[in-house]
């Protein structure tokens, strides 16, 4: 038998398996975080547009109220 034999092979296999799982997990997490950042940015832009539209509508209403006949 070689140095360590089956135990050494099992340990090496387990270590490589865990390294692969951690690598996959980190990659999936990075992809999910990038997608969330993109969605958060889009939502922030849309919120700003909605706020501007609301201010414009309110300004129009206030101007209409100020007109006296």
Swiss-Prot record:
UniProt entry tagged with the keyword Secreted: yes
Family membership noted in the UniProt record: Belongs to the HrpA type 2 family.
Originating gene: hrpA
Subcellular localization(s) per the UniProt record: Secreted; Fimbrium
Keywords of this entry: Fimbrium, Secreted, Virulence
Domain of life, source organism: Bacteria
The name this protein goes by in its record: Hrp pili protein HrpA
Main localization category: secreted
GO cellular component: extracellular region; pilus
Species of the source: Pantoea stewartii subsp. stewartii (Erwinia stewartii)
Protein role: Major structure protein of the hrp pilus, which is a component of the type III secretion system (T3SS, Hrp secretion system) required for effector protein delivery, parasitism, and pathogenicity. The hrp pilus functions as a conduit for protein delivery into the host cell.
Keyword Secreted on entry: yes
């Amino acid at each position: 038998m070689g140095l360590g034999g089956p135990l050494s092979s099992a340990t090496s296999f387990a270590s490589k398996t865990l390294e692969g799982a951690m690598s996959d997990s980190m990659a999936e997490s990075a992809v999910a975080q990038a997608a969330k950042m993109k969605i958060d940015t889009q939502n922030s832009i849309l919120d700003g547009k909605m706020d501007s539209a609301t201010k414009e509508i309110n300004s129009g209403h206030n101007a209409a109220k100020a007109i006296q006949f």
